Amino acid sequence: MATLMNPVRDPNTLSNYNNWLCTHTTANFEIFFEEKKLVGNVVHKLRSITNAETDEIILDSHHVDIRNVQVAGLPVKAWELLPPLGPYGTALKIKLENPVGLNEIIDVDIAVQTTKECTALQWLTPAQTSNKKHPYMFSQCQAIHARSIFPCQDTPDVKCTFDFNITSPLPVIASGLPVRSTSTVPQSGVKTLHRFHQKVPIPSYLFALASGDIAEAAIGPRSVVATSPDKLEECKWELEADTERFIKTIEEIIYPYAWGEYNVLILPPSFPYGGMENPVFTFATPSIISKDRENVDVIAHELAHSWSGNLVTSASWEHFWLNEGWTVYLERRILASLHGEKYRHFSAIIGWKALRDSVEHYSHDHEFTKLVPNLKGEDPDDAFSTIPYEKGFNFLFHLENLVGKEKFDRFIPHYFTTFKGKSLDSYDFKATLLDFFKSDAEASRLLQELDWDSWFYKPGLPPKPEFDTSLADVVYELAGKWRSLPESPFQPQPSDIQGLTANQIVVFLEQILLFERPLTAELSKLMGEVYGLTGSENIEVANLYLQVGLKAADKSVIGPTTDLLGRIGRMKFVRPLYRALQKVDRQVAIDTFEKHKDFYHPICRGMVEKDLFGKKDA
């Protein structure tokens, strides 16, 4: 009966969140660097959403060491870990002695510590940090890894407020606003309690912690950058010119920023993503610090998540495009406001290439190439690709062109107001869009005639939009000259790329990678030398040039490739480089992975293992 009243929308949680709703979580943890574990307890305030119709609470958990459980301040003996169920872990079942009425709230206090199998935490030795002085720890809970830190309702369909009470000998950052105290600044090595409060309800995947040798510098009136002290000045320079401009621009598109501060933590290089939109503190890869301010698009993306994803959230990972497609759309709207509409289209062209690559990797009829895939029984990490980002963007871009940009602009704040603080699925989105335009006969007709089922459920590539290619044409032309070699008289010169942005060089290299007949090893080497690509500090450029060299079977790039694979853990670079390297020399690829696998985050390590040794669904 309860299940019918409150249907579960998320197939990737084992929790009975259709019976109980977490309204607040207090996380009390001490960080033990030597033992590489967190020890403490979590207190969940759970509100009953049935009227005494269930006598058990089921929470997601995976590889956690549970010491004891209390409900309403009293010890509970009748708790157990259920048998493991694939990637979803071993759910914690707590039996209640007394029924709980509708809307009554109970406190569930769980003493817990993490284990070495925890998939959410990465522990770095001092040698793995930039100044090599102190150990470092950071979390990455998306998609379903929060359950490996503490038992919880690990689903984006549930949001609650948070208090963090974290004890550590080193500075701490969390996904809440710091509770500033009047006490003196803690001394390094002395265990100190760090408190944070998150007043905006967030899903479990946005629970975030980091601790290490971290210093901060202001990059705007409501923003700081935090990173290793030896990298602070270069990170400050990279971000201070654009961060506040980005915030003001997106506030004009939607409505004011809701989280108080917008800060950026630049993590050590093993962080597996470009960025993670943890509230208050975006966690970002050091690969954006390119010393030319050309890679800060990542910050525009993570900032946009403060509305799409963090305030308005997909109800399950099957509807992940509602987080990422919207965020890419908003990121490109920010860039268009600052740099012009041509820049938005140019960014979309780069995105289309990434989308095509992902579809080809999976195959055109694969479930994971759908905008709304079926993830029942699947690990959401296996479905992680550019597809929800770029297919989602292209759907929203199509809707914008369908009804007209001016009309769609009015829908944007309406949508983000309607679902503020809530989770939704694709059907909620469709219903809201249709309802908004019902009084506009023309827009309503166009939306009713739209083939929604094809957009949601058809695998492969969507229809390709007409992009403004003006910023791309110059690099298409240059790529065409390289395609004509060695037969043509074209002689490459450094002036060929003079005045091009890093993103234009990225598109140029992506065009080279599309050649049906790869460059010869000699031409690949010539390109690197003449255009200065071999020593580029911009990893977006360097990694693509290495892929060009590997595709050309240029043995001279194998060394730089293995070197880069030992310096960066961002999956965007690591996975394609390993795939390309193994085609040239599989043993070198395997040896490189074995050498560096402990450097990579567990999520990245697992995905590369699948790429090198396992199933194609990765």
From Swiss-Prot:
SMART domains: Leuk-A4-hydro_C
The family this protein is said to belong to: Belongs to the peptidase M1 family.
A GO molecular-function annotation: aminopeptidase activity
Cofactor requirement: Zn(2+)
Amino-acid positions noted as binding Zn(2+) in the UniProt annotation, renumbered to this chain: H301, H305, E324
GO terms, biological process: cytoplasm to vacuole targeting by the NVT pathway; lipid metabolic process; peptide catabolic process; protein catabolic process; proteolysis
Cofactor, how bound (note): Binds 1 zinc ion per subunit.
Uppermost EC category: hydrolase
Record field: catalytic activity: an epoxide + H2O = an ethanediol
The organism's place on the tree of life at top rank: Eukaryota
Binding site for a peptide: Q140, C141, Q142, P272, Y273, G274, G275, M276, E277
Function noted in UniProt: Aminopeptidase that preferentially cleaves di- and tripeptides. Also has low epoxide hydrolase activity (in vitro). Can hydrolyze the epoxide leukotriene LTA(4) but it forms preferentially 5,6-dihydroxy-7,9,11,14-eicosatetraenoic acid rather than the cytokine leukotriene B(4) as the product compared to the homologous mammalian enzyme (in vitro).
Organism lineage: Eukaryota, Fungi, Dikarya, Ascomycota, Pezizomycotina
Organism of provenance: Emericella nidulans (strain FGSC A4 / ATCC 38163 / CBS 112.46 / NRRL 194 / M139)
InterPro entries: Aminopeptidase_N-like_N, Aminopeptidase_N-like_N_sf, ARM-type_fold, LTA4H, LTA4H_cat, M1_LTA-4_hydro/amino_C_sf, M1_LTA4H, Peptidase_M1
Enzyme Commission number(s) of this protein: 3.4.11.-, 3.3.2.10
Active site (UniProt): E302, Y389
Name of the molecule in the record: Leucine aminopeptidase 2
Subcellular location as annotated: Cytoplasm; Nucleus
Protein keywords: Cytoplasm, Hydrolase, Metal-binding, Metalloprotease, Nucleus, Protease, Zinc
Keyword check for DNA damage: no
Stored PANTHER family: LEUKOTRIENE A-4 HYDROLASE (PTHR45726:SF3)
Pfam families: Leuk-A4-hydro_C (PF09127), Peptidase_M1 (PF01433), Peptidase_M1_N (PF17900)
Gene Ontology cellular component list: cytosol; fungal-type vacuole lumen; multivesicular body; nucleus; NVT complex
